[in-house]
Amino acid sequence: MTITAERPSATQDRGAEYLDRARAVAAVIESEANEIEATTTITPRAYQALADAGLFWILVPEEYGGAGLDIVSAFKVVQEISRADGSTGWAFMANSCSTGVAVGFMSPQGAQQVFGGPDKGITAGMVVPAGSGVRVDGGYRVNGRFRFASGSAHATWIGAGFVVHDENGDPVMRPDGQPDCQITWLPKEKVEFLGNWDVMGMVGTGSYDYRVDDQFVPDAVTFETFSTTPVLSLI
């Protein structure tokens, strides 16, 4: 009897490689677990281990310097990090998944701005439409208070979901009768963090509230909340 085995795909090979990286990083995270809980966020040492291993960008396509993993392989990495420390696993999941969504749905120009070059962006934040935005030339002016920004202490770009309003303060409606909702990303320095994460569980996720106060966001890093068609796909 002859048994024919299929050769693992390049994606599967990368998945195994990044899972091995996660196992190595997990040892560092486990040693930092007490400090992560004490400081309510991922420690600099744990962050650096995740970043050096390229794990924040497991869902970012290779053309932007990421791993380009499929979703199953990516969540095996998340599981491995979560096994070492639950809070770190949650924050890391929030970072890696939001980063994958951001690069997939924003314009190529925006993706290049955020993820191109040696200092690839890490995203975090609440993208449900809790804020408000007014259309201006080239983008929007956005305001709002947002909650539960897990992994935000080490993120470089912060997400904000908002409903578009007209000059009279009324929501702009789409042709289907639904409000025009958008997601955008701001450099971290344009966001005010409120430092109010004091909880019993998942302490180390750093899920702080934050405020966006009349900030301009360009179209290049903004996209429709309920779009189901990514600009860039891993498949």
Predicted ranges, named:
Residues 25-33:
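N-terminal capping segment at the start of a domain
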Residues 123-235:
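FAD-binding core of flavoproteins
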